[in-house]
A protein has these predicted regions:
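Catalytic cores of secreted or luminal carbohydrate-active enzymes
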Residues: 59-111
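Short, Lys/Arg-enriched charge-dense amphipathic segments
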Residues: 9-27, 99-106, 123-138
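Intrinsically disordered, low-complexity regulatory segments enriched
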Residues: 19, 34, 112, 140-141
Length: 153
C-alpha cells in the first residue's frame, strides 16, 4: 500500500484499510515520520466502525481525519441533518487550514505511545506565521487528571 517510490506517480495512499479513528491516531503518527500529511488519505468513516465495531463520536473522527488528507468514507443517507451540518462546517474549516496541514512542518508534541492517554501534534506554515494544533484523548477517563498542554501563540 505505502510505497515511497510511487509518490511521484500517485497523489495519496491508504495508510491502512482500518479507518477506526482511535487506531488511526497511532497509525498516522508513525506514518508521519516518513510520509507527508498530503499523501496520507485520512477519511471520516461510519460509526460503528466496520472493522472494529467501535462507536466514536463524529467530531473525534473528523479531527483525526483533518490531520491528514481529509476525505469522506461515510454514507450521506445514513447521517442526521446535524451530522451533515457538522461535516459541512468541518470541510469548510479544513479548506482554511489545508495548506498548513498538507505543506507545513510537523511537530510531535505528545506521542500516543507515551501512554499518557492523549496525543498531540502541531503543523506550522513554512513561514511559521500559522499553526494548527491537534489534541486527542485516547482513553476513557474516570476522575483522572489529563496531561496539561501549554501552547504559546
Amino acid at each position: 500500500r505505502v510505497n515511497y517510490g510511487l509518490l511521484p506517480y500517485f497523489d495519496e495512499f491508504w495508510v491502512s484499510d482500518n479507518t477506526d479513528a482511535l487506531q488511526r491516531v497511532y497509525m498516522q503518527w508513525g506514518t508521519s515520520y516518513f510520509f507527508p500529511a498530503i499523501a496520507m488519505a485520512s477519511h471520516i468513516s461510519a460509526s460503528p466502525n466496520h472493522q472494529t465495531f467501535r462507536r466514536i463520536p463524529l467530531k473525534y473522527r473528523i479531527d483525526v481525519a483533518m490531520s491528514g488528507r481529509l476525505g469522506m468514507e461515510i454514507q450521506l443517507q445514513d447521517m442526521t441533518t446535524e451530522e451533515k451540518e457538522l461535516c459541512k462546517k468541518a470541510i469548510a474549516e479544513y479548506k482554511e487550514i489545508r495548506s498548513v496541514v498538507q505543506f507545513g512542518d510537523i511537530y510531535r508534541l505528545i506521542s500516543p505511545y507515551e501512554k499518557q492517554g492523549v496525543a498531540s501534534l502541531m503543523y506550522t506554515s513554512p513561514e511559521k506565521d500559522k499553526a494548527v494544533v491537534y489534541w486527542w484523548k485516547l482513553e476513557h477517563f474516570h476522575n483522572q487528571h489529563l496531561h496539561v498542554c501549554s501552547y504559546m501563540v
